[in-house]
Amino acid sequence: ALEAALAKPENKILLLWSPQNPTGKVWTRDELTHMAELCARYDVAVISDEIHMDMVWGEHRHTPWSAVARGKWALLTSGSKSFNIPALTGAYGLIGDEASRNGYLSALKGRDGLSSPSVLALTAHIAAYQQGAPWLDALRHYLEDNLLYIAQELNGAFPELNWQPPEATYLAWIDLRPLNLDDRSLQKVLIEQQKVAIMPGYTYGNEGNGFVRLNAGCPRSKLEQGVQRLIAGINTLR
């Protein structure tokens, strides 16, 4: 399916989420290498969004696109997810092809407010990457435990789900299809009765029908409330 899409002449760019959001999929090096070969074959440029690169769990390992890249490509990322600094609006990118890089820089300099990054964002990123490793390690353990808590509670309440934590990200992509619920009815119950807003899967297209995306990147006390309210909302419809 991917090769068929890349072979179409109207498709010029592959937008890649690595790790993938919302599923939490970690692409293996072999998978990425195959993608790179196909993109080079059909002259398709790649833009790889790797903002969740630090949030990879267990034995899974993140492979940056730069390690397998061919042809035209860009790798975009930020410390905002890892260090909770999105309000500083800082991000950075790598562009492998010199002509593309120079063209991008030229276009960037012609845009008001974009030609120079925020000094505060730069300072925060430098500090985070130079001194934040112990904090990030602790955060990773905390978030991984949060995801295990979700699995424990959901599977305890609804064994047929058999939900497993994702390979990456602190976002729980939960398949509720075994429960045969109406997505919009569940959202109505969660918001109006349980007072909790959880991202419905249909926000991401028809493939997301029957799923919800729960953010585990928060204090355990808040997560516990959210999970218990999700369980209560589901029970209301069963």
Language model features: what each stretch is:
Residues 1-57:
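Active-site phosphate-binding strand-loop segment of PLP-dependent enzymes
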Residues 151, 160-163, 197-202:
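A short linear hydrophobic-aromatic micro-motif
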Residues 67-103:
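Active-site PLP attachment segment
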Residues 104-111, 128-151, 179, 183:
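Structural signature of PLP-dependent enzymes
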Residues 95-121:
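Active-site C-terminal subdomain of aminotransferase-like
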Residues 3-7, 189-198, 204-238:
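PLP-dependent enzyme catalytic core of the Aspartate aminotransferase-like
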Residues 122, 126, 141-151, 163-176:
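Conserved glycine-rich beta-strand-loop-beta hairpin in the small C-terminal domain of fold type I
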Residues 89, 116-139:
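Structural motif of enzymes handling amino- and sulfur-group chemistry
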